[in-house]
C-alpha cells in the first residue's frame, strides 16, 4: 500500500500578511540609511548594483498591488510549495518589468509608493483571491508566503552587499525556511534523510529506508540563514560543510545534487 500523501503545510494568513508588511518596512527603513557609496556597490546578483537590488525589492510590493488590481483568475494552478520551481525561467522578464515600473524615481519615493499601494491592496482582498500571474495563477494566501522568501532572501543580499544590518522579521524568516524545506521534500520525496533547520523546520526526503524511531541514520542540520542561502544558490554545499555551517551524517546525507532549489 503506497504511503499517504502528506498534507501541505498550513500558514496563518494573518501572521503571513503581518510578516510581509513588517519585512518590507524593515527594508524601506534600511535602504533609506544607505549612502551613495553603498548603493553603488555590486549586489552580487548579476550586473545589479545595490541600488538596483533595492529598487527590485520595492517592485516586489508594487507588483503585488498591481496583481491584485487585475481581474482575478478563476482557479489556482500553483501552490506555494511548487512556486520555487516555477521561477527560474522568469528572471529576465521580472528584471525588465522592475526597471520599467520603477525607473526615474528616487528610492524613498519608490518605497513609499509601493508600501502604500501594497497596504491598500491587502486590505481590500482576502486570501482566497486568485491572482493572474506569469508563473501560474495562485491564491493571495499562497502568494504571500512566497513573498516572505523574496523579501528575506533579498534582505540578506542587501545586508551582505551593502554591509547593512536590516533585521529579519522572525515570522518571515520562519515561513521562508519552511517553504524552502518543504520544496526540498517535494523535489526529492522519501524518508531516508532527515533535514533539521531549528527552530523552524524538520522534513524528511530522498528515497531509501525510512526512519521510524530513535536517531535517524542520515541527518542534515543547519541554521535558517545557511539553509536559505543553500536553497537559493547564495552558497554551495561544499563550502557550507567546510565552514561547519552544515552538519551531515550518514551515507545518504549529501544534498549537493538537489541544491539549489531556486537561483
Locate the predicted segments by residue:
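An N-terminal domain-cap segment
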Residues: 2-51
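C-terminal interaction segments
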Residues: 2-6, 70, 85, 89, ...
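Amphipathic alpha-helix face/heptad-repeat signature
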Residues: 16-23, 107-114, 144-147, 173, ...
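Short, contiguous alpha-helical
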Residues: 41-80, 130-179
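Internal, conserved structured core segments that host functional sites
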Residues: 94-147
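A glycine-rich beta-turn/hairpin centered on an aromatic-Pro dipeptide
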Residues: 171-199
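Glycine/small-residue-rich hydrophobic helix-like segments
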Residues: 189-226
Amino acid at each position: 500500500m503506497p504511503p499517504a500523501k502528506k498534507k501541505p503545510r498550513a500558514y496563518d494568513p494573518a501572521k503571513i500578511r503581518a510578516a510581509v508588511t513588517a519585512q518590507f518596512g524593515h527594508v524601506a527603513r534600511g535602504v533609506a540609511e544607505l549612502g551613495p557609496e553603498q548603493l553603488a556597490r555590486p549586489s552580487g546578483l548579476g550586473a545589479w548594483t545595490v541600488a538596483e537590488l533595492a529598487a527590485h525589492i520595492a517592485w516586489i510590493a508594487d507588483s503585488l498591488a498591481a496583481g491584485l488590481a487585475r481581474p482575478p483568475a478563476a482557479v489556482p494552478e500553483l501552490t506555494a510549495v511548487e512556486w520555487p520551481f516555477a521561477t527560474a525561467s522568469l528572471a529576465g522578464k521580472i528584471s525588465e518589468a522592475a526597471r520599467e515600473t520603477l525607473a526615474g524615481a528616487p528610492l524613498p519615493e519608490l518605497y513609499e509608493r509601493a508600501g502604500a499601494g501594497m497596504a491598500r491592496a491587502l486590505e481590500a482582498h482576502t486570501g482566497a483571491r486568485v491572482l493572474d500571474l506569469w508563473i501560474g495563477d495562485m491564491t493571495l494566501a499562497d502568494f504571500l508566503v512566497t513573498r516572505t522568501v523574496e523579501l528575506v532572501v533579498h534582505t540578506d543580499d542587501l545586508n551582505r552587499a551593502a554591509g547593512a544590518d536590516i533585521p529579519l522579521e522572525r515570522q518571515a524568516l520562519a515561513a521562508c525556511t519552511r517553504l524552502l524545506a518543504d520544496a526540498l521534500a517535494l523535489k526529492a520525496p522519501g524518508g531516508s534523510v532527515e533535514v533539521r533547520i531549528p527552530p523552524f523546520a524538520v522534513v524528511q526526503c530522498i528515497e531509501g529506508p525510512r526512519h521510524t524511531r530513535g536517531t535517524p541514520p542520515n541527518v542534515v542540520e543547519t541554521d535558517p540563514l545557511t539553509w536559505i542561502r543553500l536553497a537559493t544558490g547564495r552558497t554551495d554545499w561544499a563550502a557550507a560543510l567546510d565552514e561547519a555551517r552544515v552538519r551531515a551524517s550518514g551515507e545518504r546525507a549529501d544534498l549537493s545534487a538537489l541544491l539549489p532549489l531556486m537561483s
